[in-house]
Amino acid sequence: EETVDVQGLPFSTLTLDFVKDGRAVMSWHTEPDEIRPIPDAAEAALLPEQIKTVEQLFLTGLHLEQYRHATYSPVDYYEEGLRRDPDDVRCNNAMGLWYIRKGRFDVAGQYLEKAVKILQKRNPTPYDGEPVYNLGLALKYQGRYEEAYNRFYKATWNGGWQDAGYFACAQISCMNGDY
């Protein structure tokens, strides 16, 4: 333990270095005293019918979910997107996830089955495995473990879903005593 007298020094000039065996292991310094501008206030979302594209409907719904907006529902934006384009994979996946979070796994499965069917129409190993993984979740929560396992395994084709997919497969294997 060491005490250092810094009395009389301006706070903004302080730097503290912890050194062990000649090597810095931690360093701290003050932030400059500056008044930063306040960021602009967030703009209110347009109503779903005022938004021009399905992509913007999806992105607005995603934003509302991410920030848990108190007065707007993301579902309104996803549903409007699906009204305009029932085959939009993003909105079908988003609705499926929303219903998973609400415990409505059967309804979630309907949206996710559609998303996966559209994704795999021309490419059995789609670019993004998220809807495939999410369908696995909906099936697992319905107790349809063999189908869920197959979906989780299929989702591992995509690098972004390998960890979660293999882990979910391992969970089901352990439940079945298949170590």
What positions do the PLM features span?
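Long, contiguous interaction/recruitment modules in multidomain scaffold/adaptor proteins
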Residues: 1-52
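Residue-level recognition of tetratricopeptide repeat
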Residues: 62-63, 97, 137, 171
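Structural motif corresponding to the intra-repeat A-B loop/turn of tetratricopeptide repeats
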Residues: 67-68, 102, 142, 176
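Structural marker of alpha-solenoid helical repeat scaffolds
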Residues: 84, 118-124, 158
